[in-house]
C-alpha cells in the first residue's frame, strides 16, 4: 500500500459518501503525506458545497415542516407552467414528496437550466409518493380566460393525484370546489420544496408538448421559445398568421 499513486489513492475513495471518503483520506495522509493533500482539499470543497445545498433545501422545507408538526402526512405542492405564452396549453402539476427526502438541486424551475429540469423531472417522478398532471388547451383558455384555465388545470392535477393529499400548497392561488385544506404561498416555487417539485414537473411536461408542436408547425420556433412572445415568435405570427395551437385572445394584437 505504501507505493500507491495519487490516482490509486483517489480511486480508493470513489463511491464512498463524503464523510467516509474524508475519514479514509485523513488516515491515508499519515502514510502518504502531501500526495493526499489535493485530494483532501477536493473532497472538503465537495462537502462544503453539499452542506450549502442541504441548508438551502432545508430552508425550502419550512412550510412542510410546520404542516408535519400539525399532523398532516401527505402534502401536495401545486404549480403551473404556461400562463403567459401566446400558444399552447397551460399545464399544472401536483406532487407529494416523502417527508425526509432530499433532492439535490431542487429549486424553482425558473432558476434552473433546461438540462437541470429534465434530470430533476426523472428524479422527482422516481422519488415522489404521487404525481398528478392537469392540462387545459388553448381553446379552453380562450373560452374561460387564463386565470380560470390555470385553476382548472390545477384541479385536474389534484384529481389525477394518488393518494389523496391532506393539504395543498399552491403557488399564489386558491382553488374553489376542492374539499382539501389549502395553503396559498406567494412565490411558493422558491419557498416550498413541494411547490418547486410541481413547478419542474409542469414546466418539463409543457416544454415537451411544445417541442412536439414544433415538428408540426416548424415556422414558429416553438421548440426554442415554448410559445412565449419573443420577437422571433411575434414576427412569425405577423408573417404566417396563427396556427391551431395559438391562443386567439393572446395574439389578436399581432394579427394584421
Curated annotation (Swiss-Prot):
Entry's cofactor comment: Manganese or magnesium. Binds 1 divalent metal ion per monomer in the absence of substrate. May bind a second metal ion after substrate binding.
Catalytic reactions of this protein: Endonucleolytic cleavage to 5'-phosphomonoester
EC number annotated for this UniProt entry: 3.1.26.4
A family per Pfam: RNase_HII
Alphabetized Gene3D superfamilies for the sequence: Ribonuclease H-like superfamily/Ribonuclease H (3.30.420.10)
Residue ranges annotated for the RNase H type-2 domain, each copy included: 73-256
Amino-acid positions noted as binding a divalent metal cation in the UniProt annotation, renumbered to this chain: 79-80, 171
Domain of life: Bacteria
Compartment list: Cytoplasm
Claim: Secreted is one of the keywords in the record: no
Any single GO BP term: mismatch repair
GO molecular function terms noted in the UniProt entry: manganese ion binding; RNA binding; RNA-DNA hybrid ribonuclease activity
Listed cofactors: Mn(2+); Mg(2+)
UniProtKB keywords: Cytoplasm, Endonuclease, Hydrolase, Manganese, Metal-binding, Nuclease
One GO location term (cellular component): cytoplasm
Function description: Endonuclease that specifically degrades the RNA of RNA-DNA hybrids.
Family membership noted in the UniProt record: Belongs to the RNase HII family.
HAMAP family cross-referenced by the UniProt entry: RNase_HII_B
Protein name: Ribonuclease HII
Naturally occurring in which organism (per UniProt): Acetivibrio thermocellus (strain ATCC 27405 / DSM 1237 / JCM 9322 / NBRC 103400 / NCIMB 10682 / NRRL B-4536 / VPI 7372) (Clostridium thermocellum)
Upper lineage: Bacteria, Bacillati, Bacillota, Clostridia, Eubacteriales
Gene: rnhB
